[in-house]
Amino acid sequence: MSDFSANRPMTTRREMVLTVGPGEGDLQGGDDRVLQAGADYLHRLGGGILQILPGIYTMRNALYLHPNLTVRGSGSATVLKKAAGVVIPLVRDSDWYEARVEVEDARGFGVGCGVMLRSYGKSGMTVVKDTVTAIEGRVISLSKRMYKNMWLDERATLATIFPILTAEEGVCDVAIENIVLDGNKEENEEINGNYS
C-alpha cells in the first residue's frame, strides 16, 4: 500500500530565523542599525523571525517593520532603549520641498538618527518625521523633501523624537514578542502618539 501522507499541498512556508546579538548571532551589533539590517534582510526573503538575543540595544531611530515579520526577544533580557534626546531650534526658515534644515547646534544628531520637525502655527502643531542623511556644520540633510513649512515665527524645532518600533503604510502580519521597550523618559520628551 502506498504512503499518501507526503501527498499534501505545500502551502505553509517555513520561516527563516535570523539571530541578532551584541556579540553573537547571524548579525552582530547593539543598536537600531543591526536590527534594521535584519528586518530588511528578512523582508527580501518574504518575512521571517528576527530573533534578538539578550542585550541592551541603543535606538537612535525607529525599527521600521515589514510585512510577515516576527520580532522576538529573550524576555526581560532583551531591551530596546531609546538614546538620549535632543531638541534644538531651527535658525533658518525651511519650506516645502526643501531637504535640509539649519539648526542652532547639530550636536546630539547623527547620520541615520530619527528626527521630528515641529512648528506651532495658528492652525496647530505641524509635524514632519524623517531620518538624518548628512550633517555639514549646522546644516542637517533629511532623507526626503519636506511636505510642510517649518518657519521660525512658528517656533520650528528639530528633535530626536521617534517611536522605538513603527509599522507604516502597507505593513501587516507583524508580531512583537518578549521584548522590553524603554523610551528612556528621563532623557527624552514624550512623543505625541498621533505622530508616532
Regions picked out by a protein language model, each given a short descriptive name:
Residues 193-196:
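Beta-propeller domains
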Residues 1-190:
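Extracellular "leader-to-stem" segments immediately downstream of a signal peptide or signal-anchor
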